[in-house]
UniProtKB/Swiss-Prot annotation:
Belongs to the thaumatin family. PANTHER family: OS03G0233200 PROTEIN (PTHR31048). Induction: By abscisic acid (ABA), salt, salicylic acid, wounding, and fungal infection. Keywords: Disulfide bond, Signal, Stress response. This is Osmotin-like protein OSML15. It comes from Solanum commersonii (Commerson's wild potato). PROSITE patterns: THAUMATIN_1 (PS00316), THAUMATIN_2 (PS51367). InterPro entries: Osmotin/thaumatin-like_sf, Thaumatin, Thaumatin_CS. Residues 1-21 form the signal peptide.
């Protein structure tokens, strides 16, 4: 077999393996405004107009991974700039986590018992309604979930910031809200989020009702910003002003 033929066979096998493996993530923007999607440690960042999608593949073993949306961004041709919510160090291609407030889709693939673990979290606050889950649902807690309440419009005054609703830990700090020194429970402020998004993490130890699992290798995943039926589907229902134009090139 020639070297060229060997390379071609290797490429075809790799392509078939990739296209048949789970772990493909689609990030779709259904909001009536531009969202600058972000994903770490796999993905980076992408500008999404309404109706646009972005796909990337996360390999088995990926963990502590996040997907979120950024709003009111301005980036130059080199991908440097700033976002009002979810900013990740002033770059389009995120390498680190975003600045609160930002609604999060979190996941870890192919962990113990060959399970994928995933969730929606508002521990870092809320900026955009979101749905997240498997494209091929399975038994138990392997089904899509969402957080679509009008949290920005109803946000307590102590947590309200431009473009979103901040989290109590960032705002006030301390064990009560941050749970950094041992067990902790819900607070009145975390209950504000939980009552509106019962499937989402509302404080760091909100595991029993907020962690979802799917069997590894059985499904891909989809994140949607402003899923159908959410309060942000139409501009008139979005409670915080969005810009009519931006300056970035992305």
């Amino acid at each position: 077999m020639s070297h060229l033929t060997t390379c071609l066979v290797f490429f075809l096998l790799a392509f078939v393996t990739y296209t048949n493996a789970s772990g493909v993530f689609e990030v779709h923007n259904n909001c009536p405004y531009t969202v600058w999607a972000a994903a770490t440690p796999i993905g980076g960042g992408r500008r999404l107009e309404r109706g646009q999608s972005w796909w990337f593949w996360a390999p088995p073993g990926t963990k502590m991974a996040r997907i979120w949306g950024r709003t009111n961004c301005n980036f130059d041709g080199a991908g440097r700039g700033w976002c009002q919510t979810g900013d990740c160090g002033g770059v389009l291609e995120c390498k680190g986590w975003g600045k609160p407030p930002n609604t999060l889709a979190e996941y870890a693939l192919n962990q113990f018992s060959n399970l994928d673990f995933w969730d929606i979290s508002v521990i870092d606050g809320f900026n955009i309604p979101m749905s997240f889950g498997p494209t091929n649902p399975g038994p138990g807690k392997c089904h899509p979930i969402q957080c679509v309440a009008n949290i920005n419009g109803e946000c307590p005054g102590s947590l309200r910031v431009p473009g979103g609703c901040n989290n109590p830990c960032t705002t006030f700090g301390g064990q009560q809200y941050c749970c950094t020194q041992g067990p902790c429970g819900p607070t009145d402020l975390s209950r504000f989020f939980k009552q509106r998004c019962p499937d989402a993490y509302s404080y760091p130890q909100d595991d029993p009702t907020s962690t979802f699992t799917c069997q590894s290798w059985t499904t891909d995943y989809k994140v949607m910003f402003c899923p159908y039926g959410s309060t942000h589907n139409e501009t008139t229902n979005f409670p915080l002003e969005m810009p009519t134009s931006t300056l970035e090139v992305a």
